[in-house]
């Protein structure tokens, strides 16, 4: 397992902006209208931007990027609009498709691609210099497509940072948009392979609502004793450090073999279970504490009828696996994998409809008190984004957060990179638990281990 958790992180010098950022408008206008956001789009915990960072060996001219962005915004016109509150309480949002444009900044920095790559496994706060800061009084003041910043490097390469509002799309949607933009930058006369479908009315709640399931991803567990605390609040109170680990195909296969009895499972299922278990063991909460794993699931094909091809809204929900600390850490890999599989199986079309109806109440939010959240950016082709100067040398998030992201590995379709931030005091321990069971010399020995401090 390659690791970059404690590698030296690169400090980004200040960027030089030769001119003011520009608002790039769609190259042809559409009639102004408002776009309904579904309850899956308009959850308060999604009111942030998905931020990607790309490093390229060769720069692409900013004129080509601007022209292609203007073209692609015709197909993805809501991204050139603005969020607006709806109703007297302003709790719900919609998109004012007014064509005001997406922000594009150009910058220069005294840094080479090689220098950046030496420390790219450990994001830090200085990386935020690579994304132009939009001053705003509130979330609603920020454009749905907040900013694209092209930063030219001293070696002739470039770093491209993008920030796309999560209320407009999920990871699948952002990848769809970025691939379309890259295609038009590299081949201006190309036809887009996928047409964006923006209408969210197919996901409107039922009248009256039919909440037919308990939805543990939103409900909090029964009150715990004061000793147990709140894992989420504990994490927020701690100095955090990013941990980045890459799992090779052979290591993932070896993890699958740790399940007794054996179980047919995907790479995501075994890695999600493995990382969850390592995270809990390193935090060492009370053995009786009820814990959850929340992970994003694409439901485009699970609804009846299915969402149309090219659907450009949030088409995911959080699936929920739940157990106790003691059950998770004293069982072998089979237990955690089975929990993940059962959580996936519960997410049927009716389950999603029930969740949409539940969200109409506007009072529920994901239960993060004792949960690890995992989002997978693999299998989206994000590592293949070519704007005309070649594929990226590096692709990843702009920042590391307390939730976990699975990333693709350039050149190896079957490997995964995991990145997340953990308290500094447990970072080494977390890595040690992640390494267990990856090869014959370091098989997991959890049958003799009694995790949990309570």
Where are these regions (language model features)?
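Non-catalytic N-terminal regions of enzymes
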Residues: 1-224, 232-296, 300-311, 315-316, ...
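Catalytic core of tubulin tyrosine ligase-like
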Residues: 336, 355
